[in-house]
Amino acid sequence: MKATGIVRRIDDLGRVVIPKEIRRTQMIRVGDPLEIFVSANGEVVFKKYSPVGEMSPLAATCVETVYKVAGVPLAVTDRDHTVAAAGAGREALEKPLHTGYVHLIEQRRTWQGTPGPVQICDGARVQAAAMAPILANGDLVGSVALVCRGQAPGEEEILLAKLTAALLGRELEIRLGGLNEAWH
């Protein structure tokens, strides 16, 4: 940590500037929530907070249930990596998202595979045939990808991805309660 450390002063309001180089390499965007805590040896640590990552067991249960009942492979992502997957999407678990997929998520609307499938993660050959954003209190927190199975997805499959995204978004709203206002 000392090799990449930079000394910064705290201003009168208690603010610390995180240098652009660190924000870029750690993929910290404007508005991203950061968890601040003190380690046992007195270090103040800033950690990216992923609301979707916090509920990865629930996300895994949702996508596994959809896969068992309907045979539809889904993958759940936060804004940086895949947190849960079922079926063919398991190869993408814990992998960073591909930049093309990140651009789809940032559009904040359902994407239905036009012009063709998009790679979900770097380092995995898993592609999305459709994608539904996960929104919580109006904030984009992740996505549910319908994993490509070789043919164009049907309306029912896309609906299952949208339903899963809506359920996870609503659960996040319930869990976060009033925390979202503090992020702004």
Q: Language-model features: where?
A:
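Juxtadomain coupling helices with adjacent low-complexity linkers
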Residues: S56, A60-T65, G100-H103, G142, ...
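Structured interaction and signal-relay segments at domain junctions
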Residues: V63-G123
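A short local loop/turn or secondary-structure capping micro-motif enriched for an aromatic residue
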Residues: M27, G53-S56, E91-K95, C121, ...
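Short, small/polar residue-rich loop motifs at catalytic or cofactor-binding pockets
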Residues: A3-T4, K68-G71, V126-A128
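A short, aliphatic-rich beta-strand micro-motif
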Residues: A128-L135
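Intrinsically disordered, low-complexity terminal regulatory regions
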Residues: V7-A84, I174
